[in-house]
Curated annotation (Swiss-Prot):
Full protein name: Sulfite reductase [NADPH] flavoprotein alpha-component
Reactions it catalyzes: hydrogen sulfide + 3 NADP(+) + 3 H2O = sulfite + 3 NADPH + 4 H(+)
Binding site for FAD: 322, 356, 386-389, 404-406, 410, 419-422, 599
Subunit description: Alpha(8)-beta(8). The alpha component is a flavoprotein, the beta component is a hemoprotein.
UniProt function note: Component of the sulfite reductase complex that catalyzes the 6-electron reduction of sulfite to sulfide. This is one of several activities required for the biosynthesis of L-cysteine from sulfate. The flavoprotein component catalyzes the electron flow from NADPH -> FAD -> FMN to the hemoprotein component.
Organism: Escherichia coli O9:H4 (strain HS)
Domain (Flavodoxin-like) ranges: 64-202
Pathway listed: Sulfur metabolism; hydrogen sulfide biosynthesis; hydrogen sulfide from sulfite (NADPH route): step 1/1
The protein's Enzyme Commission number: 1.8.1.2
Residues given in the record as FMN binding sites: 70-75, 117-120, 153-162
Length: 599
């Protein structure tokens, strides 16, 4: 079925909204399209009185704006739950993604709620970077008439725990805003804290905002969504692993796997740019080692989410064993009165360093103690799924999903250790074995709506994964836009991931340019950011031609170095000073011409 798209000037949608609409409907049957058409007609007409040209007096009450700033989807889920709570309380509320928020309107907000996660070294999620920059710039307005609350999600195993939320909270207050509630900083197991916070927010807002008519709550507050899949983070699909192929050479220092998962007839859909969530199981050998070190048997009964399970099963399926945290080290030291660990208590930097260099099982080995099963369970954090950038397009692979997995392997005093999810996929799931998966949609990492738009892809290491999906999609669409890939890794002969595929794309004319950086093949190390500077003049020409820039990979070093190189290219070839170049790149981000998927 072919749909003729009218000229953009005649459309009430902006290009990004149009792209989302096209992506959401591209694989629907005529019957499904007819149903969707009726669905939206019903949404428009379900409350005609509330949508009349003359608003009811209650429409002039202060509305509540919730800004969701999410990296992995958790903040978005909390924000959606709060929106639903407020609608149930008949309050006038709207929910907006940080990337879609017109941040200059913040001065007119009366009641503002921010739900945000943190990425990298205390940075805001990608979709909130522009808003964060604006608030911390000289352009930020005074907010004396704004009351606000912030819920911050983070991971206490990282040094800059919940830093993004702390930033938003302090800056909103500095600009004159009034706190409705004190900020809440939630760890990985955030659900209970979020539930309690939502109830407090509803109570606080009930006393401030007049109750809206039900029709107005629906018309202005609801974000209508079509859920086409029954599978989610909490209800994953049980799929099967069909391919597990090592794609680095035998002499490579890296073990990178190409993993293919068969989705069967589940109907699970995804787009290039999305991530695959994988629920993994801990290595039974690791469980056995930990249990024996604590002089336990493994059959002791423990309670997990209201259910009684044997300790071994609980540890294998429900608790994080491969990532240590400062809190775990501190609590273990306090519980066991370890002479080695007690001196670290109270020193956050030392606790974090110890946690980063010493896995939980080795902490117990180095500082032995005897804990009962319940004490062990209470010490640990719940197991959470790992997210992998999807390396395929369903336009080519149909009912499969591919990911590129860098297997984490290292030694601690001669004992082999491995990452939980990566070693699960690489070592412990046999062919046709079960894998529990779900799709984490990422609307902040999408191909341009216009197939003629040039694309610049920067993805060293496993950061190349989404660009394989991009190229599969562009090839399937026969998109005429130019494509330029920057890729880097240590060695050409050992670490050129998907080499044959990239060479084929070049030969077929789908991949216009490819620049490669091999950091260990010569005396002087060369990285992708060096290639960006080297090709600065041509890069600037592409940007002037409307190219979209995509970056995927390590957030802590690579992404920052790449951004610095881009700023230098913009300044040099665009004839700008540092401040103007930064403003230019920020505008590209706002226009969704500069998108990052970093971790």
């Amino acid at each position: 079925m072919t749909t003729q798209v009218p000229p953009s000037a005649l459309l009430p949608l902006n290009p990004e909204q149009l792209a989302r609409l096209q992506a959401a409907t591209t694989d629907l049957t005529p019957t499904q399209l007819a149903w969707v058409s009726g669905y939206f007609w019903g949404v428009l007409n379900q409350q005609p009185a509330a949508l009349a040209a003359t608003p009811a007096p209650a429409a002039e009450m202060p509305g509540i704006t919730i800004i969701s700033a999410s990296q992995t989807g958790n903040a978005r889920r909390v924000a959606e739950a709060l929106r639903d709570d407020l609608l149930t309380a008949k309050l006038n509320v709207k929910l907006v993604n940080a990337g879609d928020y017109k941040f200059k309107q913040i001065a007119s907000e009366k009641l503002l709620i921010v739900v945000t996660s943190t990425q990298g070294e205390g940075e805001p999620p990608e979709e909130a970077v522009a808003l964060h920059k604006f608030l911390f710039s000289k352009k930020a307005p005074k907010l004396e008439n704004t009351a606000f609350a912030v819920f911050s999600l983070g991971d206490s195993s990282y040094e800059f725990f919940c830093q993004s939320g702390k930033d938003f909270d302090s800056k909103l207050a500095e600009l004159g805003g009034e706190r409705l509630l004190d900020r809440v900083d939630a760890d990985v197991e955030y659900q209970t804290a979020a539930s309690e916070w939502r109830a407090r927010v509803v109570d606080a807002l009930k006393s401030r905002a007049p109750v809206a008519a039900p029709s107005q709550s629906v018309a202005t507050g609801a974000v209508n969504e079509i859920h086409t899949s029954p599978y989610s983070k909490d209800s994953p699909l049980v799929a099967s692993l069909s391919v597990n192929q090592k794609i680095t050479g035998r002499n490579s220092e890296k073990d990178v796997r190409h993993i293919e998962i068969d989705l069967g007839d589940s109907g699970l859909r995804y787009q290039p740019g999305d991530a695959l969530g994988v629920w993994y199981q801990n290595d039974p050998a690791l469980v056995k080692e930990l249990v024996e070190l604590l002089w336990l048997k493994g059959d002791e009964p423990v309670t997990v989410e209201g259910k009684t399970l044997p300790l071994n099963e609980a540890l294998q399926w429900h608790f994080e064993l491969t990532v240590n945290t400062a809190n775990i080290v501190e609590n273990y030291a306090t519980l066991t009165r370890s002479e080695t660990l007690l001196p670290l208590v109270g020193d956050k930097a030392k606790l974090q360093h110890y946690a980063a260099t010493t896995p939980i099982v080795d902490m117990v080995r180095f500082s032995p103690a005897q804990l009962d099963a319940e004490a062990l369970i209470n010490l640990l954090r719940p197991l959470t799924p790992r997210l992998y950038s999807i390396a395929s397009s369903q336009a080519e692979v149909e009912n499969e999903v591919h990911v590129t997995v860098g297997v984490v392997r290292y030694d601690v005093e001669g004992r082999a250790r491995a990452g939980g999810a990566s070693s699960f996929l690489a070592d412990r799931v046999e062919e046709e074995g079960e894998v529990r998966v779900f799709i984490e949609h990422n609307d902040n990492f999408r191909l341009p709506a216009n197939p003629e738009t040039p694309v610049i892809m920067i993805g060293p290491g496993t950061g190349i994964a989404p660009f394989r999906a991009f190229m599969q999609q562009r090839a399937a669409d026969e998109a005429p836009g130019k494509n330029w890939l920057f890729f880097g890794n240590p060695h050409f002969t050992e670490d050129f991931l998907y080499q044959v595929e990239w060479q084929r794309y070049v030969k077929e004319g789908v991949l216009t340019r490819i620049d490669l950086a091999w950091s260990r093949d010569q005396k002087e190390k060369v990285y992708v950011q060096d290639k960006l500077r080297e090709q600065g003049a041509e890069l600037w020409r592409w940007i002037n031609d409307g190219a979209h820039i995509y970056v995927c990979g390590d957030a802590n070093r690579m992404a920052k170095d790449v951004e610095q190189a881009l700023l230098e290219v913009i300044a040099e070839f665009g004839g700008m000073d540092t401040e103007a170049a930064d403003e230019f790149l920020s505008e590209l981000r706002v226009e969704r011409r500069y998108q990052r998927d970093v971790y």
